[in-house]
């Protein structure tokens, strides 16, 4: 199997495209530019907010105009790690993907499928002409990996949808309806040196 055999073909086409675009957390300017150009190319309303979140709207297909607006959401940054023997600059170098058996992998670096596969899914839906749907809003948020900056910065009115589906999940065919969330805790402790007590050995006891 090679990359052209991966299904859904349109999703993996766009995943390969965004693998050519550097997108480290807090340095997403190139992928933001890519998304804006994508929106213009397909004649879709596209806007960004002050932190870089991108929203691309797609009108409903004929007969579906009265359905509720659905928001599809994914984050555009990725975890950037590489093997110690690999030379790779995540600010300028593309991700080199390869099919290994049934897996799509990256050569010596993280792949960026979290959440690149979600981004690619949204792009495939936006570009599709054979999918019936109601009004769609595709939301691409920044800096999820190091602080959820994009999500926390969203303001009322940026989206208008009634339903939001987050595509940052790891289980195909399963839908999560809730989660416990996460939290960061910063703790400070003051330490003072102390002498550790050690019990005497049997030999020391005999000597005494």
Predicted features along the sequence, with ranges:
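Short, structured patches in soluble enzyme cores that scaffold and shape functional sites
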Residues: 140-142, 167-169, 189-191
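Acidic/His- and Gly-rich active-site-bordering loop/insert found
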Residues: 2-103
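Flexible, glycine/proline-enriched loop segments at strand-loop-helix junctions
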Residues: 21, 25, 105-114, 174-176
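A glycine-rich helix N-cap at a beta->alpha junction
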Residues: 156-175
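Conserved small/polar residues in nucleotide/adenosyl-binding loops
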Residues: 197-204
